[in-house]
Amino acid sequence: MNKEKVFLEYFNKEKLNSEECFKNYKDRKVIFKKEIDRKIYFIKKYVPYGKREKAIAFGLQRDRAKHYEYISKKLDKIGIQHVHSVYSKIKRYSFFKRASILVTEYGGEELAKYSKNYMEHIELFKKFFDIYIKLAKNGIYCTDYNLGGILINNKGELTLIDLDAYKTKIILTKQYKRKLITLLRKMYTHSNETQEFEEFCKSEIERVIKELNWKI
């Protein structure tokens, strides 16, 4: 089977109504799940709108598929395990209008599935925060770092996904640090986790702040 031909079909709007549509974020980011030759693929389709659309057109921002690959190279350099893309394509309809797709293979189960019995996997959850610290020390920050955005691969290793939510910054203001920590706390404040797990997360986030020496 010609995989590229299959992947390109996901530029078609008709696919939004297909059973393969896994998640849809107001048609701006759509995730499809497709099995090809006994392998599971996730096809992400990005359609920029508004300010992002104009910024990409004028070269002020990277297309999100290209940004994923940009962050992927950064993670390779610092030795952080993540799901690599196997295919990407940008389709331009006009100077402003465009869409892109990025394809990854199935990378494992979400770490979130293990939060109810986290004590049995305590080292993985500590590693989750260790990775956050390592990213920040290398100028890489995530505004949506959560247990659903990291997988456990078939080797039992933590593996990052959703790299389009990661950013690089040279200078970090105190205000932005506060924002990052507030967003990190959402992983337990916006979920139905146990009190014990919530206390564990609070303790680990305090460790994050201390190790990064963030005066917030």
Predicted regions and their residues:
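C-lobe/activation-segment region of protein kinase-like
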Residues: 153-216
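Active-site acidic catalytic loop and adjacent metal/ATP-binding pocket
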Residues: 31-34, 130-168
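Short small-residue beta-strand/loop micro-motif enriched in glycine and branched aliphatics
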Residues: 51-55, 110-115, 169
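Surface-exposed, interaction-prone regions with an acidic/low-complexity signature
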Residues: 1-6, 10, 38-51, 60-64, ...
